[in-house]
Amino acid sequence: MKIKREHFNILRKIHKNANLSQRDLSSQLGYSLGKVNYCLESLKQKGLIKINNFRKNPNKSNYLYILTPRGISEKTKITLRFMQERIKEYDELKNELSTHKKKN
């Protein structure tokens, strides 16, 4: 499953803290409130999160965002893929610097 970077960032945030409101996510990630809402709905439709309504939540957030087992699995796969991409980029940059140093 291909997931957008924005969706991955939201998965990471709610995995750390399911009590974050949409406004909290918007503020912490630098996304518009509409974008956060759209991403959460998309993640819900893909079966990666569950959205529970808790009106008596002490921090007055009406919703609790919970990663499903599928969401946790997908987040893990994406994290691994992201790390592999970063390692590859690091190796490429390291080789470029090495080549540049040899030329000078």
What are these regions (language model features)?
Residues 1-6, 21, 52-76:
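Short, cationic-aromatic polyanion-contact patches
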Residues 23, 34:
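Key DNA-contact positions within bacterial/archaeal DNA-binding proteins
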Residues 27, 44:
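Alpha-helical residues within the helix-turn-helix
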Residues 73-104:
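Amphipathic alpha-helical dimerization/coiled-coil segments
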